[in-house]
Design a protein with these regions (language model features):
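Bacterial Sec-dependent N-terminal signal peptides
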Residues: 1-25
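Intrinsically disordered, low-complexity Ser/Thr/Pro-rich tracts
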Residues: 2-4, 92, 213-219
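Short glycine/proline- and aromatic-enriched beta-strand/turn motifs that initiate or cap beta-hairpins
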Residues: 20-94
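Short sequence motifs at beta-strands and strand-loop junctions characteristic
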Residues: 27-29, 76, 80-86, 149-156, ...
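Outer-membrane beta-barrel transmembrane domain signature
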Residues: 48-66, 149-152, 162-225
Length: 225
């Protein structure tokens, strides 16, 4: 599955010391920290999803899915008690040396399986009912057969290393352009909301896998604080 395009973010840098000298201002010195909060859109490649229980064992191949962005409003995006409702990104970073930061991040996305799509299904269902049987062919994912989503969070918790490279800095230090590149590892902890046949709905948090990620970006700093 592919993710994530960050479309807007707020970033706050904090300095750990102060001195009066002629050296240019830097927001990436050793010991500095930052906090980032933003929102994202996510796009997913096709996935293979396996289901296994006491009386079923099957796989769905090349399943299509989409994200579910929350409609923009002050209530949904800026009220403090609603900040985890939209698809969000949160990150804290600490500069372990100049221009090199170690960060901890939380990416909250949403994953919704496309309903009524046709996929390849292989396996068997032994539960009595209209879907009992062996499968090795096309299957339409109707709502009475399966609904599957991570709308309470397809959550990616990760650590990253980021390298910053200064491109331009104005003489008054009020405008800085920096490139950045980074990579990290993490694990997926979604809350899956799934309903299969007439089984009870499942909606528990669980560790669902691990991931690696990389990024490149451009950072614009408009003020020193």
């Amino acid at each position: 599955m592919n993710k994530v395009i960050t479309i807007l973010f707020f970033c706050l840098f904090a300095e750990t010391g102060f001195s009066q000298n002629a050296n240019p201002y830097s927001n990436t010195d050793k010991g500095q920290v930052y906090i980032l909060w933003g929102w994202n859109r996510a796009y997913y490649t096709k996935s293979n999803i396996s289901f296994k229980g006491d009386d079923y064992n099957f796989e769905l191949a090349k399943v299509k899915a989409h994200d579910r962005p929350t409609a923009f409003s002050y209530h949904n995006y800026l009220k403090i008690d609603r900040i985890t409702i939209p698809q969000t990104n949160f990150r804290m970073g600490y500069f372990i040396k100049k221009d090199l930061a170690l960060t901890l991040g939380f990416d909250h996305m949403k994953y919704v399986m496309d309903q009524d799509q046709t996929v390849k299904m292989t396996g068997n269902i032994d539960r009595n009912g209209s879907y009992k049987g062996s499968y090795n062919g096309d299957k339409v994912l109707t709502e009475d057969f399966l609904t599957f989503e991570h709308t309470d969070g397809l959550n990616y918790i990760n650590v990253e290393v980021e390298k910053y490279m200064k491109i331009y800095q104005s003489e008054n230090n009020k405008f800085i352009v920096q490139g950045l590149a980074g990579g990290g590892i993490g694990f997926m902890m979604p809350r899956t909301d799934a309903k299969l046949l007439d089984y009870e709905r499942n909606d528990e948090f669980h560790v669902a896998g691990f991931g690696v990620n990389s990024k490149i970006g451009l950072q614009l700093t408009f003020f020193k604080h």
